[in-house]
Amino acid sequence: MDNEKQASPPPAAPPLNWRYLLWIILLGIFLISWLGNAGRQAGDEITYTEFKQALHQGKIAKVTLEGQHISGTYHEAGGNIQPEGKDSKGFSTTRPPFDDPELMKLLEQKGVVVQAKSEEPSLWMQAIIGILPWFLILGLIFYVSYRMQQRMMGGGRGGPFGFGKAPVKRFREGSIGVTFEDVAGVENAKRDLREIVDYLKEPGQFKAVGAKIPKGILLVGRPGTGKTLLARAVAGEAGVPFYSISGSDFIEMFVGVGAARVRDMFKAAKEEAPSILFIDEIDSVGRARGTGLGGGHDEREQTLNQILGEMDGFAAHENVVVLAATNRPDVLDPALLRPGRFDRKVVLDLPDKKARQRVLEVHTKNVPLAADVDLERVARRTVGFSGADLANLVNEAALLTGRERKKEVDMDMFNLARDKIVLGAKRETILGEEEKKLVAYHESGHALTAWLLPEADPLHQVSIIPRGMALGVTEQAPEEERHSLSRAYLLDRLGVMLGGRISEKITFGDVTSGAESDLKQATQLARRMVCQWGMSDKIGAAAFSRSEEHVFLGRELSQPRDFSEQTAQIIDDEIRRILSEVERKTENLLQENRAKLDALAKALIEAETLNLVEVEKIFKNVKELPQEGHNEAVATGAG
């Protein structure tokens, strides 16, 4: 089920409707303007000249002087001086900016009632003008604070002062929708976690023999191995409240927010014990203290200290189990991993072939499959796939099926989806004839060495269709998972990596930049053989690691090298020696099988993609040239 549908977070404060507030402000401005003009007598607008004429004619009964503005009324017997001849009791006009000394004398002579008003606003108007700016400033501050809180709290949870509220998702009993039946391929992990489920269901059975519930369980595994799904399955099986939060949700821009959220989260879990509290990606707050760029007083360390304190503070009757997931257990603080905090560590490995088949069966429950679909074959071709990768494979196959307007997902769709994930999507890149020939020989070098070297992974297919960031690909499909790598296997693997560059060299007498990735991978592999795996006779059974950790991962700012400059020189010499020997042997191998190389490259230019059966058919029809003539051909090709 969807997390968003099942989660029941605390009710959020109703959002402010800023449109209504804007209309209120505009209405207030209108009222102020209207009240300011309300004291002025309404009437027809006339010119100052017309006003003077009416005054001389004795038609004006009363005037009100307010600055430059003049308003008044006519005698009842009089009329409004207008061309249309309409009667009007009142009028208004504006005096010119210069002084008119005759006006007051004329008003007195005609017996006009004169009333004067001050230009200064009234007392209540002055109060509004003085207070309104402060209201606007305070409103702006409140609005900015509210928006900041919305961003940090996911919608304003907790009110204006609710930064310390943990943005935790709460799943009710029975609403998880995930059980151990929905999690395949991690049987060992499920066996360890089933004890926790049994304890939460029947604690008395365990307490009778003096057993205590583990305070914390750390789920360790690569990304996509099902750590979060397994945690939800534990809550679904146990039937207890389940709280879920990400480690990054604790850290904000304000000091102390992380620790406050930890307290709030643990308080909520304790109130509904027995319950399960799940912290995803705990390495974001649980990294080793006193290291990295933050020093010993950053916000992350305060949050970690609060987590440690809360886990120590559980009482015996508080059946709260803390589940945490990480793919970087090496950067976690040792105090977090000691017994009494995270008592149990559950490791989730990549699934093997049988486990992959079970995972595929789970993810294809609601997918209509064609009769030719063999999930065991799909599992055999997906070595190294995690549970999330397999779910993505099924979804990609379904998407391709929908694009083709088919009603069932067949085996071809699974093959296309796998190629898209492993090799990359096809690119509409048109290569010139020379470049296409170059790429064909490069990939043929990889494919031929993979086919000839006895310890190399079996060849699956070779293609010169641009995919992803590569102009061509050679795919090897190991028959089974390798958990330990022999020296012979690694040397043959290096030979396959260098085969493309060597093929360019012996065919065109030059090398290109297309082997950049191959050289980088080969150098890294040779360095690990020498420095970490003791596969160099000159270095012997010793390990010399050169740290590649970054400061932000929680390691020291500087890690001293644990070997001398002389040893470093020997390491570099050994790496260079291994690569040179592999290059020489691979070059001799391709020279001896030059006819196969040429035939494969020619067929690849025509067909663009060849599978293993087609490659072997090409090789069976090739007769190798005599060694003397073959060397002459190589020399000619090299120029």
From Swiss-Prot:
| Entry coiled-coil feature ranges | none
Q: Which InterPro entries match?
A: AAA+_ATPase, AAA_lid_3, ATPase_AAA_core, ATPase_AAA_CS, FtsH, P-loop_NTPase, Pept_M41_FtsH_extracell, Peptidase_M41
A single GO BP term for this record reads: proteolysis
The residues listed in the UniProt record as binding ATP, with positions renumbered to this chain, are G221, R222, P223, G224, T225, G226, K227, T228
Gene Ontology cellular component terms for the protein in this record: plasma membrane
Might you give the EC number(s) for this enzyme? 3.4.24.-
The way this protein sits in the membrane is described as: Multi-pass membrane protein
* Topological domain spans for side Cytoplasmic: 1-15, 145-639
Q: Give the main EC class.
A: hydrolase
Q: Which residues lie on this side of the membrane: Periplasmic?
A: 37-123
Q: Which cofactor does it need?
A: Zn(2+)
Residues binding Zn(2+), per UniProt = H442, H446, D518
Where found, per UniProt? Cell inner membrane
Task: Tell me, in a sentence or two, what this protein's role is.
Answer: Acts as a processive, ATP-dependent zinc metallopeptidase for both cytoplasmic and membrane proteins. Plays a role in the quality control of integral membrane proteins.
Q: Subunit structure of this entry?
A: Homohexamer.
> This chain belongs to which protein, by name?
ATP-dependent zinc metalloprotease FtsH
- Please report the organism this UniProt entry assigns to the protein: Nitrosococcus oceani (strain ATCC 19707 / BCRC 17464 / JCM 30415 / NCIMB 11848 / C-107)
Classification of source organism: Bacteria, Pseudomonadati, Pseudomonadota, Gammaproteobacteria, Chromatiales
Identify the gene encoding this protein. Answer: ftsH
